[in-house]
A protein has these predicted regions:
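A glycine- and small-aliphatic-rich helix-loop capping segment at beta-alpha/alpha-beta transitions
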Residues: 50-54, 114-117, 158
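Loop-to-helix element that buttresses phosphate recognition and phosphoryl-transfer chemistry
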Residues: 75-79
Length: 169
């Protein structure tokens, strides 16, 4: 007789291109995409994020936050922080993260050092949010595959406002 319960399902997706950040998958992961924009750089900025239900393009939430003055990289970090905080607040435990900033992706994963002092505190804040999750992996994607988060950040810069939109399941 098998020691494994017949209804036990092992949740484990291949991590093609993802950098492992924390833990093991305990459930199907949600997908978080983030972005940041500054116009000009530095100048009025916004960070934004969208969280999708596991294996779908159906959003759980989308959020952007206006920043009166920041660099593009600061705005990118703010997009990541916004997404992590909202996902944590929603009780999400398993997370795949995607963004189009190689710098932020690799710094967050720990593969690149943080050389700019203005990014160190944002990096620390983002990493501190990891305590809320069981599993996190992160991946760089091309800008065109990050269109939803990109649209949010551009909306934030244009509207000079901050918005949270929740969607029904």
């Amino acid at each position: 007789m098998s020691a494994i319960h017949p209804f036990f399902i092992k949740w484990s997706l291949p991590l093609d291109g993802y950098l492992h950040v924390k833990g093991k998958q305990t459930a199907p992961p949600h997908l978080l995409q983030f972005d940041g924009a500054s116009d000009p750089n530095p100048g009025p900025s916004a960070g934004g994020a969208v969280l999708f239900h596991p294996g779908t393009t159906d959003p759980v939430f989308e959020r952007y936050e206006f920043i009166p003055h920041a660099t593009n990289n600061e705005a990118e970090y703010n997009g990541l922080i916004i997404g992590l905080q909202e996902a944590a607040d929603a009780g999400i435990k398993n997370l795949l993260i995607e963004g189009d900033s190689n710098l932020i992706i690799n710094q967050f994963a720990g593969t690149w050092k943080i050389k700019a002092e203005n990014l160190a505190s944002l990096h620390k804040k983002a990493r501190a949010l990891l305590t809320h999750f069981d599993f996190v992996a992160i991946k760089h994607i091309p800008r065109e595959k990050n269109a939803h988060a990109d649209r949010l950040t551009n909306e934030g810069v244009a509207q000079k406002d901050s918005v949270l939109r929740l969607f029904e399941s």
